[in-house]
Amino acid sequence: MSIKTEQYVTDNYPYAKKAGEKFAMDPLVILAQGSFESAWGTSNLSKKYNNFFGITAGGSKNEYWDGEIYQAQNKYKLKFRVYKNPQDSFYDFARLISSKYKSAHAAGQDYKTYAQRIAYSPYISESNGDSREGYRSAIINLYER
């Protein structure tokens, strides 16, 4: 494991564990997906805005997200959620999976089935250049690390 990888796991496993307990998901699945979405916690979105999962700003405010947004300055101009702290990002992610992606959530304790279901769900947007099969493979490989 690289130093960056070890640091990400050390820093974020406690958040994933709490979110996993609260929303009945394997914390390592949460951690794997967060590592992919945030480039091991090095992305601008995770470092500056505590958004470790690339969650866009659609939907309603909730107990983990107060409605603050950041608009990316790239060709997609997507708006992303801004979180007060990393724990809120992990909670909001697990809440989102449990409420909007029920098929993936139902497999939240089986990482291979979860990866398949989330990769082939509306969570992934191929219009933004995402590859469903690449995403599925990445989640599985990161989990197994």
What positions do the PLM features span?
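Catalytic cores of secreted/periplasmic lytic hydrolases that degrade extracellular macromolecules
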Residues: 1-145
